[in-house]
Design a protein with these regions (language model features):
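Conserved ABC ATPase "signature" region
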Residues: 5, 9-34, 86
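Conserved ABC ATPase signature
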Residues: 38-42
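Hydrophobic anchor residue at the start of the ABC signature
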Residues: 52, 80
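Conserved catalytic motifs of ABC-family nucleotide-binding domains
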Residues: 59
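Helix N-cap at the start of a conserved alpha-helix in ABC-type nucleotide-binding domains
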Residues: 74-76
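ABC transporter nucleotide-binding domain
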Residues: 82-166
């Protein structure tokens, strides 16, 4: 993957260590079978892996990841999460900042999170549990049905233990 050699050079990795550093990234992200392929021919998931490899090469103190597992199947997503978790735990030398639309991903990978509204206004900041305790007042479920029998719907609602009006 020429991309990784290029970014290793940009990040100042000495020439005598580049191959070793690139191989380490390739192995971390399970890209061994794709090392000789052009980036444009990789699947979407492998392109995500390559993007993360570019971000982590050279062990920078701050790693920025934009939706690192978006569009991945569940198995690939879990793999990516384990990679990100290992990076953030590695000698506590790198801080990982990521953006995501997935609360599940944020909870799996973050010790602190901020929630933005309209692309820029932070509404809350803290641990997942702090945010839930402070801002979560429940859930709203909206169901659209073609034909309604209000008695059956109320019975179903009661079976689920839900409160509120239909």
């Amino acid at each position: 993957l020429e991309h990784l050699k290029f970014y290793a050079t940009i990040k100042g990795i000495p020439e005598n260590r580049r191959e070793e550093v690139v191989e380490d990234c390739i192995n971390q992200l399970n890209l061994m079978d794709h090392r000789d392929k052009p980036a444009g021919t990789l699947s979407g998931g492998n392109k995500r892996k390559l993007s993360v490899a570019v971000a982590i090469i050279g062990n920078p103190p701050i790693i920025l990841l934009d939706e690192p597992s978006a569009g991945m199947d569940p198995e690939a997503r879990r793999f990516m999460w384990s990679v990100v978790e290992k990076i953030s735990q590695r000698d506590k030398k790198s801080a990982v900042i990521l953006t995501t639309h997935s609360m599940e991903e944020a909870e799996a990978l973050s010790t602190k999170m901020g929630i933005m509204v309209r692309g820029g206004i932070f509404r809350c900041y803290g641990s997942s549990q702090h945010i839930k305790n402070k801002y979560a007042t429940g859930y709203e479920l909206e169901i659209k049905i073609r034909k309604s029998n209000i008695e059956e719907l109320n019975d179903f609602k009661n079976q689920l233990g839900l409160q509120g009006d239909l």
